[in-house]
Amino acid sequence: MANEITWRLEHEKIGRLLLHYAMPAVIGTMVNALYNIVDRIFIGQGVGPLAMAGLTLTFPILLFLQAFGMLIGAGAATRVSIYLGRRENEMAEKVLGNAFTLTFIITLATVVPCMIWMKDLLLAFGGSEQTIPYAQDYLNIVVPGTLLTSLSFGFNAVMRASGYPKKAMFTMLIGAITNVILDPIFIFWLDMGIKGAAIATIISMLLCTLFVMNHFVQKDSIVRFHKGTFKLEKHVVWNILTIGVSPFALSLIRISEPT
C-alpha cells in the first residue's frame, strides 16, 4: 500500500491527484459541520429556545479549544507530507509521535482553565441565569472530551496527508452518522436534554478517534506509531508549530467575528 501511494504521487497527473485528495477533504469538512447542525436541530426541537441560546454561548469556548487541535493537526499533517515527499519516513513518524504527545499536553493545559473559569467565561459572552445552566450542562461533558476532538480531527488530517484521503473521509462519516443516530436516542428517548446531545457527540468522537488511532498501528500504514517517537524533540515540535500557527490564528479570528 505504501509503495502504491508513493507511485501515485510521483506519476499521476496533478489534476487527478488534486481531485483525489481535495474532494474527500471537502466532504470531511462538510461532515464536521454536521455535528453542530444536528445538535442544533435536535436541541431546538427537543429542549427549547433557552437551550439553543445556551448552546450558542458554548461556541467561543469550543472554537478556542479546537484552534489548538488545529495548531497541532494542521502542522503535523503538513510536516508528515513534506517528509514523506523527501522519503524521510523516520522523520515523518517522529512528527506523528510528537504530535500525539503534544496533543495530550496542550489539551490538558487548555481544558483545565476552561473548566475552572467556565461560568465567568459564559458571563463574559453574555450568558444569563436562564441560559448559563444549559451551556454548563453541555460544556461539562464536551470540554473534558476535547482530547477526543483534537485526536480525531487532527490525526484525520495526518491520515489524509499521508495518502489515505478516502479512509479519512469515511472515518469522519462514521462519527457523524453515529452522532445523528444517538442524538434523538439521548435527547428524546432517554429524555436527557442538552446533556444527551453532549454525550452523543462525545461517543461519536470516541468512535472516530478509535478508527483514526487504529490506522496508525496497522502494518499497511505508510507512517505508524513507534515507542521511540513519543518523546518530544524541540526541532520536531518547532516544525509542527511553525506551520500550524497560521490555521491556529485564523481559528482564533473566527471567535471574534460577529455571528
Predicted regions, residues:
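Alpha-helical transmembrane segments of multi-pass membrane transporters/permeases
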Residues: 103, 158-182, 199-202
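Helix-loop interface residues and adjacent transmembrane-helix termini in multi-pass membrane transporters
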Residues: 37, 46-49, 83-86, 161-162, ...
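Hydrophobic/aromatic residues in alpha-helical transmembrane segments
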Residues: 23, 39, 76, 117-118, ...
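Hydrophobic transmembrane alpha-helices of multi-pass small-molecule transporters
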Residues: 64-67, 111, 179-184, 209-213
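Small-residue-rich hydrophobic transmembrane alpha-helices
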Residues: 52-112, 149-168
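Residue-level signal for short hydrophobic patches within transmembrane helices
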Residues: 15-34, 38, 61-68, 144, ...
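Short alpha-helical transmembrane segments in multi-pass integral membrane proteins
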Residues: 1-22, 80-145, 189-244
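Residue-level detector of conserved catalytic or cofactor/ligand-binding positions
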Residues: 251-253, 257-259
